[in-house]
Amino acid sequence: MNIKSRTNSADDLAWVHLIERRKQVELWQFCCLRQSYSLELSPNIMEGVNPEGQLVMVQWSPSNDLQRVKITLNIHEVTDKAAVHHHFKLVPAGCESIIIDIWGILGLIHDEALRRFYLAVLLNNELMGQFFNARASRSHHHNHACGLLEHSHEVAVTAAMLCWRYNVGPLSVCVAFIGGLLHDIGKIHLFYNADTRDGIAGSHESYNFMVLAEPLALLYRNSPKIFEALSSCLSVKIGRRSEAYIPASMVRLCDNLSMEVCHWRTAFADVPPHHWYAHSAMNDQWYKRLG
């Protein structure tokens, strides 16, 4: 994911493997989020990619020559085809760009401890299945299926972009993204996301740490400072005037912004275009718009 320019719709996530190697070309299979391709490519295009199969980020070119694909991110740690295909199946229709961003941030994560933590979370199929389908609230903001994923992605991207814009360091950008993505993950155990009566009604922040216990424990052993910074993004903020870590401040700010924009959009959802004010039943607030 390019924090500076995220509008390139040509980026795609693909499981790739070599089908056949010929004299001057190679035949590769690309299994993407929604479809598959078999392409003849110059050998240099796929240099460094495991021919047995792995996950990559690709950028498509409209040309039909042997240079039509550019590998923008080589995710060499992910070589389990079954795990990748399971992840693809979890993707709700219309959320493909979110999944690309979620994996694309690996292109910026160079700290090994943080990278291992993040991959451990992404490759937990049971956790991701719950996370992708959950609601962010019962009757407040993003209260639809997949709403938690949409809200968390908004917070992650906006917080990371603010950290980049204010030049607080590449590691802070990554912590802001991951902290924003996971700041509400404990909500999968709240009553409105539970299939049975086992769901609880309470503070989801406590459940953030329960859900992420194993990868957080490993992160603490490998990098106590990053553990502390990421934990500050996941914890309850009561009675604190400011955060010690800037990524946590950005996550908190962007969390509130995402909720507010959702309320604003919902208020105007069924209002005629010529109306410039509307009431949100979600938070009993009047909103105005400029056009």
Residues covered by each model-derived region:
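C-terminal membrane module of polytopic membrane proteins
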Residues: 258, 274-289
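Divalent metal-dependent catalytic cores for phosphoryl transfer on phosphate-bearing substrates
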Residues: 139, 144, 161-273
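Short nucleic-acid-contacting surface segments enriched for D/E, G, S/T with interspersed K/R
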Residues: 42-59
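Beta-strand secondary-structure signal
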Residues: 13-15, 29, 57-59
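OB-fold/S1-family single-stranded nucleic acid-binding modules
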Residues: 61-92
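Structural detector for short beta-strands of small beta-barrel domains
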Residues: 2-23
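Acidic/His-rich, divalent-metal-binding segments that scaffold phosphate/diphosphate chemistry
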Residues: 80-198
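OB-fold (S1/OB) nucleic-acid-binding surfaces
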Residues: 20-41
